[in-house]
A protein has these predicted regions:
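C-terminal motif of bacterial Sec signal peptides marking the signal peptidase cleavage site
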Residues: 13-16
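Winged-helix/helix-turn-helix nucleic-acid-interaction surface
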Residues: 10
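Sec-dependent signal peptide recognition
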Residues: 1-7
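Extracytoplasmic copper-binding redox domains, predominantly the cupredoxin/blue-copper superfamily
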Residues: 18-129
Length: 129
């Protein structure tokens, strides 16, 4: 009987974790960028002010770094600074960001040598006319 309660308890905990991941993956976004082994897809994206981009892990351990260029350790000098923690869970939302200032935003994956292997991207944010 005790085993039954332990198993039921563990199933309940695992079910609640699954629901949290589903909620995280359902973040409203205008655009989605996939982050995989040394790539962001699409690598270059053009959006309007006020639109939201979310980055989804397509495999591996990745982040979204829009603060310091991982290749030269210089600031990107983006109109707004953004960055995320690294995520390993496949299919999980790495990061979601709503761009409020027009301009060109550069970012990379600062994990290991990912940026030097081509894991870089840009988001161009246009004003709404």
């Amino acid at each position: 009987m005790t085993r039954f309660f332990i198993v039921a308890f563990l199933i309940g905990i695992l079910s609640s974790c699954e629901n949290e991941n589903e909620d995280n993956n359902n973040i409203n976004a205008d655009y989605t960028v996939f982050a995989g082994n040394y790539y962001y897809d699409p690598q270059n994206l053009t959006i309007n002010v006020g639109q939201t981009v979310r980055w989804i892990n397509d495999g591996g351990h990745h982040d979204v770094n829009g603060e310091i260029n991982s290749l030269n350790n210089e600031p990107f000098d983006n109109p707004e600074v953004f960055n995320s923690d690294a995520i390993s869970e496949v299919g999980a939302v790495i990061f979601s960001y709503t761009f409020q200032t027009p301009g060109v935003y550069h970012y990379d994956c600062s994990v290991g040598g990912h940026a030097s292997n081509g894991m870089i991207g840009t988001v161009t944010v246009n004003t709404i006319d």
